[in-house]
Amino acid sequence: MKDQSWDSSYEWKAVTLLTLGFGLVGLDRWIIAPLLPTMSRDLHLNYQDAGNIIAVLGLAWGVFAIIGGGLSDRIGRKKVLIPAMVAFSLLSGFSGMANGLVSLLLIRAVMGVSEGAFCPTSFATTNDASKPARRGLNLGIQQSTFPLFGLAFGPIVATQLLRFITWRWVFVLVAVPGLILAVLLAITIREPPSLGTTDHVQRAPMSEMLRHRNVPLAMLALFCAMAGIFTLSALVPSYLADYLKLGNTEQGLVTSAIGFGGFLGQLVLPGVSDVMGRKNVTVLSFILGAVFVYAFAQSVTLGALFATLLVGCFFCFGLLGLITGPIAAEAAPLGLISSTTGIIVGSGEIFGGGVAPIIAGRVAQSFGIQHTLTMALVALIIGVLVTAFLRETAPRRLAALGAPVPSPSRSEG
């Protein structure tokens, strides 16, 4: 019957909870960025320290995205999802207890471990729960809350709370929702049939995952997108406060454009790529992202800063959703969605979310924070060159071109 062929009720409950969960990952990860100008005064941090604080989480995230993705393909989604969510929520609260750079780096590194394990596992769980016709839509919806919670609501919430409480208590407050959601996920999420007795037959070595041309290209493309957007996300608040001399409220308002633009981009672009094609949308997004990052660097008024940053991040964050969502899923061997996504996300995080902010912090410290925008721009331009070699995999686009449509990579069909 209809219910036996597809459980839509479970699909929407699971996707809703996983969407909220990934939004909280974004909030817990990025709430620190608008707090850094205030924290820097209390903890005596400089731009290099700020870049390192952002980078250490990205490096740990990258390594454990690779490990966690493969682990959840073997032992099950819930055994990775629930402990990871509890851990990163608690560690976000512990960030408020840091009394210096070393303790903050340690807390954020361990937080990156848990968030890295959660990320590809949550994408695979959304993929498991989604009807194939809604897979791209659901993955786009899920990933769109990362910038919405972390980079749109986060700066506004943080800068407004600072009027009443210290930055330490801001971290404590944002940790609570994740603990509640972990309980709801534990009650709701089911394991996919592919984790049963056929698991050992279906799994392939890493070399099999890398055989599809789009996997190594997606790794490079994600590095470029993350190097651009995470450099902006980490250092734009300090650029606005220190270089353009904006106050806390103005800085929070402009910085929120990163999140609102990213939310819309991750919500819209994966679906657009179903029609226009993965390759076309990816290349065009890198080009337009670079154009608007350049425009942001030339802007000085609040309206121009907000508008150019919003549109630039629409394309940049849309790239993150597109590369780690449908492009990764359609390049994955049968039954290895989480593992393949983990490799792509992990490599992108290590270099784009880890190494790039360290370099950006050094650039800001040595040459001036305004030059970090040039670094983001160069990364996006390189992304145009990389994605020009992608192979088209969108089923509707292939059908429109009269090309053969490959069978779905996911083991459930």
Predicted features and spans:
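Cytoplasmic helix-loop-helix junction between adjacent transmembrane helices
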Residues: 107-147
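Extracytoplasmic gate region of multi-pass secondary transporters
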Residues: 32-33, 214-266, 320, 325, ...
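Juxtamembrane intracellular "pre-TM" segments in multi-pass secondary transporters
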Residues: 2-8, 192-219, 406-408
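Helix-breaking motifs and short loop linkers at transmembrane-helix boundaries and internal kinks
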Residues: 44, 76, 97-103, 245, ...
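Glycine-rich segments within core transmembrane alpha-helices of 12-TM secondary carriers
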Residues: 137-155, 345-356
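Conserved MFS/SLC helix-loop-helix module at the cytosolic interface between two early adjacent transmembrane helices
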Residues: 63-99, 273-279
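Helix-loop-helix hairpin linking two adjacent transmembrane segments in secondary transporters
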Residues: 142-187
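C-terminal transmembrane helical hairpin of 12-TM major facilitator-type secondary transporters
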Residues: 276-326
